[in-house]
Design a protein with these regions (language model features):
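Lipid interaction determinants
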Residues: 6, 17-136
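Sec-dependent bacterial lipoprotein signal peptides
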Residues: 1-15
């Protein structure tokens, strides 16, 4: 029963992340504001701690829902490029590990970003993977 619940949660997260508005789609691959020194919180509702993304230069850190992660990213505002490099994380045992693994997997697949107001969207080509809201 627990595995079924986790599978349904993971499918819901993936399905909701696959949608894209035409306004966002038209901005993918175009010049974007710089991401350096920004903090973001995942906009999707997930059980447990909400994943975060902190960007300082080409270093990325945050919390994936239970474990903290860290790594590098190649970010190019001239074309909205975002490519996460190899990432590491703490290794705590977590109840929502499948959600965390999906989050980390999507971070690793992203290759573009779009900023609209206080919203950051990470894409794989034209497929929306993750949506964040700006944190203070």
């Amino acid at each position: 029963m627990k595995n079924l619940f986790l599978s349904i949660c993971a499918a819901a997260v993936l399905a909701s992340c696959g949608s894209m508005t035409s306004a966002s789609a038209s901005k993918v691959g175009k010049a974007q504001p710089a991401l350096s020194n920004t903090k973001w919180t995942l906009a999707e509702t997930v059980k447990g701690k909400v994943p975060t993304l902190n960007i300082e230069g080409e270093k990325i850190t945050g919390n994936a829902g239970c474990n903290n992660y860290f790594g590098t990213a190649t970010i190019d505002p001239s074309n909205g490029g975002f490519i996460a490099g190899q990432m590491g994380s703490t290794k705590m045992m977590c109840n929502n590990i499948s959600v965390e693994q999906n989050f980390m997997d999507m971070m690793g697949k992203a290759n573009k970003y779009v900023i609209t107001g206080n919203t950051l969207e990470l894409y794989k080509d034209n497929l929306l993977l993750l949506k964040f809201t700006k944190s203070e």
